[in-house]
């Protein structure tokens, strides 16, 4: 009995990452033993993701407004190099996906298209939607978790209150600390939430439906692994001039794992902000760069759009020259940056990319259908890469500034 208590206390008092690993293992075991119980555990996962999604909009709004209002004269938020890394990283991810698709060409067994889905008609529509999100009603932006709109209003309010009395600034600062406290409490519940998510996912799918798409998943996941373990570390090394892997693995472990199971960049914003605080990054920087990254830093989405589009091209027997492939990389990168402005995200931007090759919308929507089938893995890996990269690039720019 004492041994059991000792084991339980070790689990309770363990590092959060170890607790998450234990939650993953427990979820797999439960799904293997009882599918019904595992499906019931979905409530725990839903509550955890719901809590993160609920707190994220108000966290971003209060933190950004407080940070700008309390900003000291002459301080530098370091946003330009961070945004540059976001955009360059997304483009390099698309180029990596093109290279992998040429090296390991895949074809698809097309299925019924995604019913009721409404893809954008062109790149202009994607960008137009993104721009109009800036002028959204602030209450509606908070209600719908429109982070572009939330950022715009928070920045505007922060600038307006920058010259307010110190008491007003202190109220904003105290509110940001209060919301941060709630976030830390929710994050401590991550092992329980991830236990529920893992148990339900395995019980619902068993991953058996993915067997027919092994080669496609191989190219997708291989591209994402190359970006996470080769391209991103190289970019960070160029920035900080020292071994990037300790920072890379910290971001993957503490941000990527949670994002993988929540499958939501928005839900992972509080996790990323807590990690930035742990890495001693200036709040002025990460309070803006993390929610902005959740909107425009979309390396995983660029890979998904590129790989599935080229798989459709191969299936239709269309020959692709290098110039067109490079053009696809640029279109995929720009589209990926606007993925947050499209319901359904990266998958519903595939018809836009397919239009480059004259592929009909009917066929393109069947490709989207394939995307939904493999989504349990593709969407998880995509979100893990996107979200962990937000912290990685923010931390890299912070360390580069400290070094200079």
Swiss-Prot record:
Membrane topology designation: Multi-pass membrane protein
Q: Where are the transmembrane segments?
A: 11-31, 44-64, 82-102, 144-164, 179-199, 218-238, 290-310, 316-336, 363-383
What the entry lists under InterPro entries is as follows: Na-dicarboxylate_symporter, Na:dicarbo_symporter_sf, Ser_Thr_transp_SstT
Q: Note the Pfam families from the entry.
A: SDF
SUPFAM superfamilies listed in its UniProt record: Proton glutamate symport protein (SSF118215)
GO molecular-function terms, A-Z: neutral L-amino acid:sodium symporter activity
Briefly, what is this protein's role?
Involved in the import of serine and threonine into the cell, with the concomitant import of sodium (symport system).
Its recorded name reads Serine/threonine transporter SstT
Q: Which organism is it from?
A: Desulfotalea psychrophila (strain LSv54 / DSM 12343)
Q: Which gene encodes it?
A: sstT
């Amino acid at each position: 009995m004492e041994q059991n208590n000792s084991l339980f206390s070790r689990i309770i008092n363990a590092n959060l990452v170890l607790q998450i690993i234990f939650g993953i293992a427990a979820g797999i075991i439960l799904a293997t033993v009882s599918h019904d119980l595992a499906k019931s555990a979905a409530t725990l996962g839903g509550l955890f993701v719901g809590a993160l999604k609920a707190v994220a909009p108000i966290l971003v709004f209060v933190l950004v407004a407080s940070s700008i209002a309390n900003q000291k004269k002459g301080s530098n938020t370091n946003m330009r190099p961070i945004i540059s890394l976001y955009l360059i990283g997304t483009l390099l991810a698309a180029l990596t996906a093109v290279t992998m698709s040429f090296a390991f060409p895949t074809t698809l067994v097309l299925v019924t298209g995604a019913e009721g889905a409404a893809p954008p008609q062109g790149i202009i529509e994607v960008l137009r939607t993104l721009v109009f999100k800036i002028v959204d009603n602030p209450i509606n932006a908070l209600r719908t978790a429109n982070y572009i709109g939330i950022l715009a209003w928070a920045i505007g309010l922060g600038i307006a209150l920058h010259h307010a009395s110190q008491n007003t600034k202190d109220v904003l600062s105290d509110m940001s600390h209060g919301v941060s406290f709630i976030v830390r409490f929710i994050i401590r519940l991550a092992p329980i939430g991830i236990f529920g998510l893992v148990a339900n996912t395995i019980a619902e799918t068993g991953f058996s439906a993915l067997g027919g798409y092994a080669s496609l998943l191989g190219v997708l996941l291989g591209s994402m692994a190359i970006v996470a373990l080769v391209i991103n570390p190289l970019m960070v090394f160029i920035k900080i001039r020292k071994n990037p892997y300790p920072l890379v693995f910290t971001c993957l472990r503490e941000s990527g794992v949670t994002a993988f199971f929540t499958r939501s960049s928005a839900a992972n914003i509080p996790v990323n902000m807590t990690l930035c605080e742990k890495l001693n990054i200036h709040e002025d920087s990460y309070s803006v760069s993390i929610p902005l990254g959740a909107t425009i830093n979309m390396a995983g989405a660029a890979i998904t759009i590129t790989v599935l589009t080229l798989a459709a091209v191969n299936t239709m027997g269309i020959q692709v020259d290098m110039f067109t492939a490079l053009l696809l990389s640029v279109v995929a990168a720009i589209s990926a940056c606007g993925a947050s402005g499209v319901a359904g995200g990266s998958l519903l931007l595939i018809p836009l990319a397919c239009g480059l090759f004259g592929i009909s919308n009917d066929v393109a929507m069947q490709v989207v259908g394939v995307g939904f089938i493999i989504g349990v893995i593709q969407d998880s890996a995509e979100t893990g890469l996107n979200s962990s990269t937000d912290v990685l690039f923010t931390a890299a720019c912070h360390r580069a500034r400290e070094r200079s």
